[in-house]
Amino acid sequence: MKKVRVLTAEEAALLVNDGDTIATGGFVSCACPEALSKALEKRFLETGHPRDLTLFFAAGQGHRDGTGGDHYGHEGMVKRVIGGHWDRAPKLGDLALSNKIEAYNLPQGVISHMYRDIAAHNIGTITHVGLYTFADPRNGGGKLNDVTKEDLVKVVEIEGQERLLYKAFPINVVFLRASYADEYGNCTVHREIGPIDVTAMAQACKNSGGRVIVQVEKIVQGGSLDPKLVAIPGIYVDSIVVGSIEDLSLIHISEPTRRTPI
């Protein structure tokens, strides 16, 4: 099996192109690929690229202090944001409220299912979730401001029943965080709070022809990981980045003695 490519965060940031759709993992202050997002923000501030990104995420990410999703909160860096929870990234919210970006709020659980449907090359996620709410296109379709025009949600009828179709789209890049990776890119999440969609997100990006980049705590010898703990098989992973201890938690707390050894 071929060994995975190991990059610095700065090198990984160069893999994101203008106009890409990028999905980021994480849940509030946990399991966020902070080193990757910081490096991408730094590149944009220094060079003006990448720009016009579409940012896609389910759970809110960050600590309302410039971390997580707020690394993308710069005019010109993103043109569209599709998220399940916006509260953790006030800079992104300000861009939406000032009509500087196209902005959508879709149900968080639906976005989790969208990753799976994108991976499966389905046309989208069909569900009753969101009917007659803000996500229903008859009530705005999740659009958050006046410059957001495209309908990402459609009402369909199946067997005489109304459902919502949340349309699928390709993902060009995914930033994920895991605990350990082996030399072949197999990644565990045993030291995170949970898997948080990482398997489906990696599959969705890989099956879109995109680039899967995973931030980890450390790289271990191939064959040393318990296969039952592997959440992201190496066949989905393009590059690994080893993050610093400061990037393990957005609230800067690290208690290694309380973590489960592998």
Question: What does each of the following model-derived ranges do?
Answer:
Residues 252-262:
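Single conserved hydrophobic/aromatic residue that forms the stacking wall/gate
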Residues 99-188:
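ATP/pyrophosphate-binding catalytic subdomain of soluble kinases
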Residues 186-210:
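Gly/Ser/Thr-rich active-site loops/lids in small-molecule metabolic enzymes
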Residues 2-108, 258-259:
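N-terminal active-site beta-alpha-beta segment that forms phosphate/nucleotide-binding
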Residues 5, 14-15, 45-50, 72-75, ...:
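Solvent-exposed alpha-helices and their adjacent loops that cap or buttress functional pockets
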Residues 79, 170-172, 210, 238:
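Conserved acidic residues
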Residues 9, 25-27, 32, 53, ...:
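Fold-independent oxyanion-binding glycine-rich loops
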Residues 220-250:
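Terminal amphipathic helices with adjacent charged low-complexity linkers/tails
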